[in-house]
């Protein structure tokens, strides 16, 4: 797991999380896996490009090596507190996340932003109606039929 946390002056954070790609439901072939790994490495390189004028060379063959290399490259940069422009969107549940589509981070010194909005990017928190749950403790009173006593008369006067 690779987690990169971005923080603004107000202490608000946005997180980019990268997981190890494995074959499964959505990644069926070696080619698909390589494509996903390349896209993932491209996102990491976007962040590094904000701090380094020339992208450092690296021979990485595993996800763990990529994590270690990324940490080694970014740790000294945290202290610089360099200002970055970041594309933060909402997910379907209304939580903020760093977008993974296209260019999502760049140096604030760039006057012409290359960050673009795509049709799938949610920029407003989705409004989701609350589900009405039945409270198991709030049970309506049950009506019991009137029972007659042995004489056939009820306690009630009428």
Predicted segments, located by residue:
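Short beta-rich binding modules
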Residues: 1-158
């Amino acid at each position: 797991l690779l987690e990169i946390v971005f923080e603004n002056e107000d202490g608000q954070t946005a997180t980019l999380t990268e997981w190890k790609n494995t074959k499964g439901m959505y990644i069926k072939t070696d080619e698909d896996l390589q494509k996903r790994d390349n896209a993932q490495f491209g996102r990491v390189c976007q962040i590094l490009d904000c701090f380094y004028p020339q992208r450092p060379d690296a021979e990485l063959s595993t996800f763990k090596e990529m994590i270690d290399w990324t940490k080694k490259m970014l740790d000294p940069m945290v202290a610089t507190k360099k200002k970055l422009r970041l594309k933060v969107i909402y997910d379907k549940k209304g939580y903020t996340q760093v977008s993974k589509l296209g260019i999502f981070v760049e140096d604030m010194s760039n006057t012409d932003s290359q960050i673009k909005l795509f049709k799938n990017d949610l920029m407003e928190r989705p409004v989701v109606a609350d589900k009405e749950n039945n409270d198991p403790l709030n049970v309506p009173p049950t009506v019991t039929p009137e029972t007659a006593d042995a004489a056939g008369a009820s306690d009630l006067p009428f």
